[in-house]
Amino acid sequence: AACKLVIHAGDFVAPFAARELENLGCPLKAVFGNCDGEKQGLEKALQPFGEIKKAPLMLNHQGLRFLIMHIAAKLDVHLASEKFDVIIFAHTHKPELRKEKKTLLINPGETGGWLSGKSTVALLDPKTLSAKIIFLE
């Protein structure tokens, strides 16, 4: 199945890195990370195919309610609210998948692999509300 949406939880670091995601050929929704200093440059780079906002970003996609943030702040509060089917965060750069009650928590790790030496993404199947970590080469 084709990609319907790319969600990025921050730390593009530079606009040139963000532009590479246009090659995926699907829309992108993103939040700024703490290493995204060039905010206007990122907004401009993503404008042709996506958008980037200050976290947290709430969105509905394919019948699921998403919360996207860079740092997993107030995670217990968001989980207790039961308002979200999927919560995506990234600050630690460590891949993580877990389910808390009815909410799927996803940390895709880091695409670039600059800190951990491992380039990873998470792939979500919205029909089954399941995800897997994929290691890129």
What is each stretch, according to the model?
Residues 24-25, 83, 101:
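Short, structured coil segments at secondary-structure junctions
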Residues 5-11, 29-34, 67-70, 86-91, ...:
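Active-site neighborhood of phospho(di)ester-bond hydrolases with catalytic His/Asp-centered motifs
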Residues 13-16, 35-41, 73-78, 88-99, ...:
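Active-site environment of divalent metal-dependent phosphoester hydrolases
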